Amino acid sequence: MMIHGFQSSHQDFSFGPWKLTASKTHIMKSADVEKLADELHMPSLPEMMFGDNVLRIQHGSGFGIEFNATDALRCVNNYQGMLKVACAEEWQESRTEGEHSKEVIKPYDWTYTTDYKGTLLGESLKLKVVPTTDHIDTEKLKAREQIKFFEEVLLFEDELHDHGVSSLSVKIRVMPSSFFLLLRFFLRIDGVLIRMNDTRLYHEADKTYMLREYTSRESKIANLMHVPPSLFTEPNEISQYLPIKEAVCEKLVFPERIDPNPVDSESAPSE
């Protein structure tokens, strides 16, 4: 399932007052990976860590939301909910650096499961997160509309020492009057479990908010005996068989006072 051939690219697309940016480049260098692992208090990071990859949606006034691997890993819970499976010990041993290393490996989620929903951007102006009962209109998304812009960005991927896959990717498509984004964490531990955490983001040009839906699905492989195993590697196909464990609907409401003459988004703050 690994995706190879990393050709760096930087794509910008304007959608009204919004600038959409998709940056893709090579995996992080080992020294940078070690430094980040220390910062995150994790003994190791995913085999393929794209620390500089990002998908950003930013208003000319500076506020917005972006999706990156580092912030996603900050949401990994290293202290509870650990999966105890047959391959865990073997996998951890394979990640211990050097045969003389006697350090006690701190508990951490070696599946890199994250409930990351994006990083809010802006200083004085920021999107306001408000719970809602509104849902993204999936029928609208099925309508045949011209795709003005499409991009997919891989944030991290790991084959769990050949015991499955853990990956995080984000893709966006822009139609004439709206855009739709899907951030997907997908975990498959062969013979054990499949888990999928999806964050969907939808904005229509005439609205003063975005809708954000987060769903977490999960099933033990033992409960999927009625499903063809060939679907286990296809997130889009297997999702319908995974029970929903959690669902959160939110509005990302725009600031009330937006600069009527926003600066060129090239110079808008991105932190």
From Swiss-Prot:
Residues 173-271 are annotated as: Interaction with PPP2CA. Interacts with PPP2CA. Interacts with PPP2CB, PPP4C and PPP6C. Interacts with IGBP1; the interaction is dependent on PPP2CA. Associates with a protein phosphatase 2A PP2A(C):IGBP1 complex. Interacts with PPP4C and PPP4R2. Its main location: cytoplasm. It comes from Rattus norvegicus. This is TIP41-like protein. It comes from the Eukaryota. It is found in: Cytoplasm. Belongs to the TIP41 family.
